[in-house]
């Protein structure tokens, strides 16, 4: 692993969190690391909180490929954090015992109306801003696949497949499989209107395109991981697996499937 010694702590700046993070900073300093207040100077970014804090940390720091991300949970271990705040010394023990590895997690690249793209680590969701059936023309690469009618769609990465995607009965996907999963939210299926009616996987080299069918009021709400984006006039949405990857510090004996087993079985 390349030398990294500038560490930045990402957390919610409340009094209780500042008190909780201070011992972490002291421990990092005692291990020879430089604690920096400017994230641009960091090559290690530690999120303190939970899965949501980790998603915020990657988004707010623009999914930096030159940094190593570490998740520390304040409650219990999550899918992204491998360490808890009360046992942070175990992280440094793992370093010493070489019981760590760097995982590269895929991100989604989302382009709306050919504007500058944004990225998601878990998923991108598209939903109607009004309580009525939402219509999307669905294209796989250049092929028109279906006309979707329903509440919306979720497009997830493999690591994001255990989140919002799973709540709508999407499949849990091994992160070693470069892919994006497309899942329906309350699709309309009857004798007149049909959709595939199930989630489907696209290989990592394909592009999903969603065209919003407008009737004057159907402007979608775009969800990027745990944030809602205010993009009022989105009409053409392209989603693909990005070349941008997030490098995350993980324990060797705490794999994705260990976490699936603990959380769901």
From Swiss-Prot:
Keywords: ATP-binding, Cytoplasm, Kinase, NAD, NADP, Nucleotide-binding, Transferase. GO terms for molecular function: ATP binding; metal ion binding; NAD binding; NAD+ kinase activity. The active site is at residue 51. Disulfide bonds: none annotated. NAD(+) binds at residues 122-123, 149, 151, 162-167, 186, 226. It catalyses: NAD(+) + ATP = ADP + NADP(+) + H(+). GO terms for biological process: NAD metabolic process; NADP biosynthetic process. Its EC number is 2.7.1.23. One of its GO terms (cellular component) is cytoplasm. The keyword NADP applies. Transmembrane segments: none annotated. It is found in: Cytoplasm. Signal peptide: none annotated. The keyword Translocase does not apply. Coiled coil: none annotated. Belongs to the NAD kinase family. Involved in the regulation of the intracellular balance of NAD and NADP, and is a key enzyme in the biosynthesis of NADP. Catalyzes specifically the phosphorylation on 2'-hydroxyl of the adenosine moiety of NAD to yield NADP. HAMAP family: NAD_kinase. This is NAD kinase 2. It comes from Halalkalibacterium halodurans (strain ATCC BAA-125 / DSM 18197 / FERM 7344 / JCM 9153 / C-125). The lineage of its organism: Bacteria, Bacillati, Bacillota, Bacilli, Bacillales. The gene is nadK2.
């Amino acid at each position: 692993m390349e030398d990294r010694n500038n560490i930045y702590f990402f957390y919610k700046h409340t009094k209780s969190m500042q008190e909780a993070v201070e011992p972490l900073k002291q421990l990092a300093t005692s291990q020879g690391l430089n604690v920096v207040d400017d994230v641009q100077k960091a090559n290690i970014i530690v999120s303190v909180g939970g899965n949501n804090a980790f998603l915020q940390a990657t988004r707010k720091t623009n999914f930096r490929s030159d940094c190593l991300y570490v998740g520390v949970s304040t409650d219990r271990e999550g899918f992204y954090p491998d360490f808890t705040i009360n046992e942070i010394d175990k992280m440094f023990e793992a370093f010493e015992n070489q019981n760590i590895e760097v995982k590269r997690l895929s991100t989604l690249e989302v382009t709306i109306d050919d504007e500058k793209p944004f990225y998601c680590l878990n998923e991108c969701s598209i939903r109607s801003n009004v309580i009525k059936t939402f219509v999307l023309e669905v294209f796989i690469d250049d092929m028109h696949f279906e006309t979707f009618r329903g509440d919306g769609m979720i497009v997830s990465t493999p690591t994001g497949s255990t989140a919002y995607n799973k709540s709508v009965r999407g499949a849990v996907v091994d992160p070693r499989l470069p892919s994006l999963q497309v899942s329906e939210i309350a699709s309309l299926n009857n004798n007149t209107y049909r959709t595939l009616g199930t989630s489907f996987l696209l290989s990592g080299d394909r592009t999903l395109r969603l065209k919003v069918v407008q009737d004057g009021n159907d402007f979608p709400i775009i969800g990027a991981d745990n944030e809602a984006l205010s993009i009022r006039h989105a009409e053409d949405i392209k989603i693909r697996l990005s070349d941008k990857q997030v490098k995350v510090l993980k324990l060797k004996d705490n794999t994705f499937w260990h976490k699936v087993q603990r959380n769901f079985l």
